[in-house]
Amino acid sequence: FARGISRTADLVFDLRFLPNPHWIDELRPLTGNDVEVRAYLSAEPAWSETLDRIESLLIDWIPRYWAAGKSYVTVAFGCTGGRHRSVAAAVEMAERLAGAGFAPNVRHRDLASPPRDTIERHPGRASASEGEDELNR
C-alpha cells in the first residue's frame, strides 16, 4: 500500500504478510501476471490457504451485496508495490470466481509502476532502505 489504499474498494485484503517476490532478483522485474511469480507464491502454503479463505468469503458475500442492491462489488488486493502479490492474487481470484459462475473484471492499479527498493521493506531490516536504516539508528 505504498501508493495508498484503494478508495473505491468494498473489500480490501492486505497480502504484505506473504513472501515478497521483489526480493528475488530474477522475479523483481516480473509481475504477478508471470508464471514464475505465481509459481513462487504458490510454493508458500499460506498463499493457497489465504486465497481459499478469501474465495469462500467472496462466494458467500457477493450474492449478499447483490441482494442489498449493489450491482457490483469491488475487491482490492494490496501489497507493498502493487506488482507481484496483489496482481497474482487478483488474477487467481478472478479465475476462481469465474469458475464459480461469477463474471469478474480485473484492473491492476499499480502494475505499470516501476519497482522501487525505497518502498519495499527487505525482510530483516527495520526500514525500507539502507539509507533510511542509517538515519534511524
Where does each model-flagged region fall?
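C-terminal accessory "lid"/substrate-recognition subdomains
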Residues: 1-75, 98-100, 110-137
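Catalytic cysteine-centered active loop of the rhodanese-like fold, especially the PTP/DSP P-loop
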Residues: 71-94
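Post-Walker A helix-loop "phosphate-sensing" segment adjacent to the P-loop in P-loop NTPases
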Residues: 94-104
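A structural preference for short, hydrophobic beta-strand core positions in alpha/beta folds
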Residues: 106-108
